[in-house]
Swiss-Prot record:
Active site: 678, 721
GO annotation, cellular component aspect: cytoplasm
Biological role: ATP-dependent serine protease that mediates the selective degradation of mutant and abnormal proteins as well as certain short-lived regulatory proteins. Required for cellular homeostasis and for survival from DNA damage and developmental changes induced by stress. Degrades polypeptides processively to yield small peptide fragments that are 5 to 10 amino acids long. Binds to DNA in a double-stranded, site-specific manner.
Lineage, uppermost ranks: Bacteria, Bacillati, Bacillota, Clostridia, Eubacteriales
Domain Lon proteolytic as annotated: residue spans: 591-772
Originating species: Clostridium acetobutylicum (strain ATCC 824 / DSM 792 / JCM 1419 / IAM 19013 / LMG 5710 / NBRC 13948 / NRRL B-527 / VKM B-1787 / 2291 / W)
Keyword annotations: ATP-binding, Cytoplasm, Hydrolase, Nucleotide-binding, Protease, Serine protease, Stress response
Chain's gene name: lon
Family: Belongs to the peptidase S16 family.
Record protein name field: Lon protease
Cellular compartment(s): Cytoplasm
Keyword flag Transcription regulation: no
Length: 778
């Protein structure tokens, strides 16, 4: 390969690759490119053309231009109206950019020129050229984009490099493929590259031709079917077999005229009926039209149920069917009260957020019962296709409406209470964002014209009362959340679970098991508390109901086998029926200890206590963290350690303790992953206690995020954390001052038994947690 170095002006091309021996014209508009042309014309009329990697870039830098291009000779320059220039060039040889010399006022680079060698006598190269000529002939025939003269022209070319370049210039292929051929400096490699490209293109062209043949066959088939159908119609008319079909058409006509349809729906139905009449009821197309008409006629376009706006009755129903959940009940009563005054009020869109089993789904049924609306539930868990919400278009085989329209059909009224269950469990896929499809459904200003893809008709959802449920808000997209009124349904207290079990679950299970009147099962209060405390660990009451059902089944078995008339269940007999205790209640230490602090945590099943331990050992200032802590919790511990080092003197700690001591912080139950920033104050207290040799009050629990400067920041889940601490025997809780407003969410009975200490600074936490406070007379 002959090489020669040159310094040439450079023009970056957009969407065009020029090969050696190729004559082409293009327009130049960029100032730098016009300057480069003028420079080339003043010298030997040679210029280097290389293609941009991205045609959209207006001012490419060195990394945006392919390093291999073509040295060209300028044949003609034509000034166009405006500032543009049209230039005619002929490719001479390949070139590669060694380095850029300047960027202004035009791009100039040092180029290595590669000239092809005369090695066309090699047998392998001759064979490659012959195969390419044959395959290129097939390409010309199949594509129809290149004239047959091109094949004849190639037969006269002996040089392999020139042959490969000219073939490449004729091929209609992607820019990346052309650049790959241009990058091939070696002639043999270039020929192999061109052959591969041609073979790939031939496969694609062959597939295109086969597809075209199949499409034509289908069109011919449909035309033949139409002709046969017309013949069948004539024969049916002669034989009188179309009476049944006419009767069906007549029945649809009467249903459409008598049905309570909107004007648009009636017009669409009559139009489809006309198509059915033409196609024939028993044709493949007719079956799809009949299904579509059945859907239109089955929907409650104008059917409504009358709202019962009796506030007193509604409150009685809600209280009777559910214990607690006062926030939800109050919001429904408010809606009914305002609706009573203003008839045009749209239904609220409530989102009940809380852990599993707290009654989110069942309260929705009670709301429907209270306001006298039909109830329909739509489960959204696992939905990852927007067509599940909006429906599939009728062009697809087996198309059906989406879940919203299906729910309206089930409801049999256009103002039901529609429960969208587990809205946080929706996901996205290549089929579309299913959550985005709900935006129109839940937008009260737009949902009066909800359009399902299958129906292609406007359906009014504005009178629907939507209630959604979720376990967490984290996975719900923000635009969707903005359309809903969030009501948090937190876990039940022990007292609330007791009342729910006594007043709802036990009577329900006894009724489901059809207990005869002469047989009696009685649950003592102590037994209910014992089940709650030792056999369930949840925020809701699902597991509690299963345990009660298990006891009743065992008692019924005992009654049948031993012919007993009545059985009373106490805490002792619970163990007999359910086996050994599954859980033991968290209890705090009964004595004050150094480096042992009780923290508080929120879980999906409610609150829990979070003991934190810290020990000091000889070392060089390392902080070791164990207990399967998450990244946020580790960073919280690091921040706490830095704060302790910065304020060691204030707390009576040797200011150079880190030179000869290591701290190990451990959070027990190491198999359970833990994360979150709210254990910051707990970790600081454990470190200060261990370093200052001061004991921590065993009856104190705490929660709060900390900063490097010692401020205590707000946390979430205070109610659940407080309930857990109370169960464990804590009587004093230190919380961030910013959470003072959340104390009212704690049940009044428990609030009166807990002393809350509000902390804005870490000093307040340590003063109330350490025995002796934080004076430095250690």
């Amino acid at each position: 390969m002959n090489q020669e170095n040159k310094v040439l002006p450079l023009i970056p091309l957009r969407g065009l690759i020029v090969f050696p021996y190729m004559v082409v014209h293009f327009d130049v508009g960029r100032d730098k490119s016009i300057e480069a042309l003028e420079k080339a014309m003043m010298n030997d009329q040679q210029i280097f053309l290389s293609t941009q990697k991205d045609a959209k870039i207006e001012e490419p830098n060195e990394d945006d231009i392919n390093s291999v291009g073509t040295i060209c000779s300028i044949k003609q320059i034509l000034r166009l109206p405006g500032d543009a220039v049209r230039v005619l060039v002929e490719g001479i040889s390949r070139g590669k950019i060694d380095k850029y010399l300047k960027q202004e006022p035009f791009i100039e680079a040092e180029i290595t020129e590669f000239k092809d060698e005369d090695n066309y006598e090699e047998y392998e190269i001759k064979a490659l050229m012959r195969i390419i000529t044959k395959e290129f002939g097939k390409y010309v025939k199949l594509s129809g984009a290149v004239t047959k003269d091109a094949v004849d022209f190639l037969k006269d070319i002996k040089e392999p490099g020139k042959f490969a370049d000219i073939v490449s210039s004729y091929l209609i292929i992607k820019q990346e493929q052309k650049q790959s051929v241009l990058n091939s400096i070696d002639e043999k490699e270039r020929l192999e590259n061109v052959l591969t490209v041609i073979k790939d293109e031939l496969q694609i062209l062959e597939l295109e031709r086969n597809i075209g043949v199949k499409v034509k066959e289908k069109i011919d088939k449909s035309q033949r079917e139409y002709y046969l159908r017309e013949q069948i119609k004539v024969m049916q008319d002669q034989l009188g077999d179309d009476d049944e079909e006419k009767a069906e058409i007549k029945e649809y006509t009467q249903k459409i005229k008598k049905g309570k349809l909107t004007k648009e729906a009636k017009e669409k139905a009559l139009h489809e009926l006309k198509k059915l009449e033409n196609a024939g009821a028993y044709s493949p197309e007719g079956a799809g039209i009949k299904t579509y008409l059945d859907w239109i006629l089955s929907l409650p376009w104008k059917d409504k149920t009358k709202d019962n706006l009796d506030i007193k009755r509604a409150r009685e129903i809600l209280n009777k069917e559910h214990y607690g959940l006062s926030d939800v009940k109050d919001r429904i009563i408010e809606y009914l009260a305002v609706k009573k005054m203003s008839k045009s009020l749209k239904g609220p869109i409530l989102c009940l957020v809380g852990p599993p089993g707290v009654g989110k789904t069942s309260i929705a049924k009670s709301i429907a019962n209270a306001v006298n609306r039909n109830f329909v539930r739509i489960s959204l868990g696992g939905v990852n296709d927007e067509a599940e919400i909006r429906g599939h278009r009728r062009t697809y085989v087996g198309a059906i409406p989406g879940r919203i329209i299906y729910g309206m059909k089930q409801a049999k009224s256009n103002n039901p209470l529609m429960l969208l269950d587990e809205i946080d469990k929706m996901s996205s896929s290549y089929k579309g964002e299913s959550a985005d499809a709900l935006l129109e459904v839940l937008d009260t200003s737009e949902n009066n014209k909800f359009r399902d893809n299958y129906l292609e008709l406007d359906f009014d959802l504005s009178d629907v009362m939507f209630v959604t449920t979720a376990n967490t808000l984290e996975t719900i997209p923000r635009p969707l959340m903005d359309r809903m009124e969030i009501i948090e349904v937190s876990g039940y207290t022990y007292e609330e679970k007791f009342h729910i079990a006594k007043e709802h679950l036990i009577p329900k299970q006894l009724e489901e098991h059809n207990m005869p009147e002469d047989k009696k099962i009685t649950f003592m209060d102590s037994s209910i508390y014992y089940i709650i405390e030792n056999y369930t660990r949840e925020s809701g009451v699902r597991s509690l109901e299963r345990k009660i059902a298990a006891i009743i089944r065992k008692i019924i078995t005992e009654i049948v086998e031993k012919d007993k008339s009545s059985i009373s269940v106490n805490s002792r007999t619970v163990k007999k029926y359910l086996g050994e205790d599954v859980f033991s209640a968290d209890k705090i230490d009964k004595e004050d200890k150094i480096g042992v602090v009780t923290g508080m945590a929120w879980t999906a099943y409610g609150g829990d206590t979070l003991p934190v331990e810290a020990v000091i050992m000889p070392g060089n200032g390392k902080l070791q963290l164990t207990g399967q802590l998450g990244d946020v919790m580790k960073e919280s511990a690091q921040a706490g350690y830095s704060y302790v080092r910065a304020n060691s003197v204030k707390y009576g700690i040797d200011k150079e303790f880190y030179k000869n001591k290591d701290i190990h912080v451990h959070v027990p139950e190491g198999a359970v992953p833990k994360d979150g920033p709210s254990a910051g104050v707990t970790m600081i207290t454990a470190m200060v206690s261990a370093l200052s040799d001061k004991k921590v009050k065993h009856n104190v629990a705490m929660t709060g995020e900390i900063t490097l400067t010692g401020r205590v920041l707000a946390i979430g889940g205070l109610k659940e954390k407080t309930l857990a601490a109370y169960r464990a025997g804590v009587d004093t809780i230190i919380i961030p001052k910013q959470n003072e407003k959340d104390i009212n969410k704690v049940p009044k009975a428990i609030r009166g038994k807990i002393k809350f200490i509000l902390a804005e600074e870490v000093d307040t936490v340590l003063e109330n947690a350490l025995i002796g406070g934080i004076n430095n007379d250690n």
